[in-house]
């Protein structure tokens, strides 16, 4: 009898602890710092994905066999692939939702809130974050329907990544869409990276300019990697 009561108490205690933990997390998210933390964490996840995705894309320069083997190996472990996709989807949704809420809070707080002497002059990237976000989201949907599912790709062949990429980027309009979209991603990313550092406390008059430069260089090197693929196909370097 005593053992049953003890087990029940422990189970009840665990439930109470879980509920309390969820409540603390919810209250933390309600704060501006909490929303910025979510933006930073999800942004880091998405940034990591972009690095991995670019590394995969650049294998097109290694030839048909290497690129297609990469695609086959990527799809060989379905649970891992779908797990990564779910994490990415949740990260995108949380990132977008937190950014919308922060933008709303910022608008409500004007002209008092965020009006700091050192931050009056904002960059073009920071001013267009809320505009570039929806455009990038629309491009991601197009990209998934184009080169992931093949719905918008008339010559799509499953797991033939090399042929799919070359056939797609041989069309100038498709290449232009991708290049313009990646330029927007670069603009979004250059501001997002240094904002991530700022959100976790790396804000100092001495180091902030250096972090901004690092963020810009890193973002544009990454985007140059993505853009190099359609440019190479259009130039006939990859065929």
What do the predicted segments below correspond to?
Residues 2-239:
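Membrane-embedded alpha-helical bundles that constitute the cytochrome b-like, heme-associated redox core
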């Amino acid at each position: 009898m005593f053992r049953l009561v003890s087990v029940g108490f422990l189970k009840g205690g665990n439930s109470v602890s879980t509920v309390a933990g969820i409540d603390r997390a919810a209250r933390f998210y309600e704060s501006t710092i909490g929303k910025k933390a979510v933006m930073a964490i999800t942004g880091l996840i998405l940034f990591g994905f972009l690095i991995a995705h670019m590394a995969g894309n650049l294998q097109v320069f290694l030839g048909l066999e290497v690129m297609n083997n990469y695609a086959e190996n990527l799809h060989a472990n379905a649970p891992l692939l779908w797990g990564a996709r779910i994490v990415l989807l949740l990260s995108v949704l949380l990132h977008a939702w937190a950014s919308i809420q922060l933008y709303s809070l910022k608008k409500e707080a004007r002209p008092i809130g965020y009006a700091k002497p050192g931050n009056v002059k904002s960059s073009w990237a920071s001013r267009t974050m809320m505009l570039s976000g929806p455009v990038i989201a629309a491009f991601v949907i197009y990209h998934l329907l184009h080169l992931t599912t093949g719905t918008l790709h008339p010559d799509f062949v499953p797991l033939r990544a090399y042929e799919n990429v070359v056939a797609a980027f041989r069309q100038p309009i498709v290449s232009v869409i991708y290049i313009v979209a990646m330029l927007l991603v670069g603009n979004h990313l250059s501001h997002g990276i240094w904002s991530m550092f700022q959100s976790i406390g790396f804000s100092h008059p001495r180091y902030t300019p250096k972090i901004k430069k690092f963020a810009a260089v890193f973002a544009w090197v990454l985007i140059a990697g993505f853009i190099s693929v359609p440019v190479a196909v259009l130039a006939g370097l990859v065929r």
